[in-house]
Amino acid sequence: MPTQKTVVLVALIGGLIATGCARLPYQTTTLYQGQRAAVVLQQEVEPARYSHPAQLRADEIGAILRGFSIRAQQRLPLRWFAEERPPDRLFHEDELLVIAPLLAEGLQKAGPEERVHFSLFAPGQNRSESRTVTSGWVAVRGPYLYLTVEYLHAEVPIRSLDAYYPNNPSLPPLPGAYLLFFEPGRYWVMERGGARALEFREFLKGAPLVVPRPGQARP
C-alpha cells in the first residue's frame, strides 16, 4: 500500500507535468506565407469571444498600427536608462504596406475563438541560416483591438540541426517582453479584464488614413 510520502510525491510530479504541458494557441489556417510576411489564424485554448469576423480596411489597419511604438521591457537599473529615450516605432512604412492588407484579410476570416498571428521577415546576419523576425498577434473584441508583440527584430534561425543539443544556435529565441505605447495615448486603455487595448473605433473617427498606391502593397 503506498505511503503518504509516495502519494504526495506522485501528486507533485503530476502537477509539474501538467504545468509544463500547458496548452498554447495553435494554428488552424495559413492565410499567407511569403518571403516578407506570414499570416495565420490561431485557435485560442480558452474562451475568447472575439468580435470576429471584423471588418477593417487595410488603410484603417495601417492608421492603427502607425500609432504604436515599443520598447523592450528592462529590469532595474537598466530600466532607468531605457526610459531616458523615447520608444521606437513598431512598424516602418514599408512594413505597414505589407502587413496591413494581410491583417485586414485575417480579421475578416477569423472566427470568434481565433486570433490573427503575423510575422514580418527581413534578411538576417547570415542570410542562408537566419532571418530577422517581428511577430505577434491581433484580435478585436467589442470596441477594443488587442495587439501583442512576441518578437521584435529578433534573429531567428531558418534551418534546424539538432534540437537536442543544448547550445544549438538553430533553436529559436524565447519571445521577448515589451512595453507598447500608442499615440494619442487617450485611446490606449486598460479594459475591464485588466488587459491593455486600443479603443480603435473612437481613434479611427479622426485618424488620417493613407491609401496605398497600386503596386505598393506587395508582400
Task: Indicate residue ranges for each PLM-predicted region.
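Bacterial Sec signal peptide processing site at the extreme N-terminus
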Residues: 15-39
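Sec-dependent bacterial lipoprotein signal peptides
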Residues: 1-19
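Acidic/histidine-rich, surface-exposed loop or edge segments in extracytoplasmic proteins
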Residues: 37-48, 60-87
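Short acidic/polar, Gly/Pro-enriched loop/turn segments located at secondary-structure boundaries
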Residues: 53-57
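Mid-length scaffold segments of soluble, non-membrane domains
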Residues: 96-132, 136-142
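A mature extracytoplasmic/lumenal domain signature
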Residues: 120-124, 134-136, 144, 149-153, ...
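Polybasic, proline/glycine-rich intrinsically disordered low-complexity segments
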Residues: 154-218
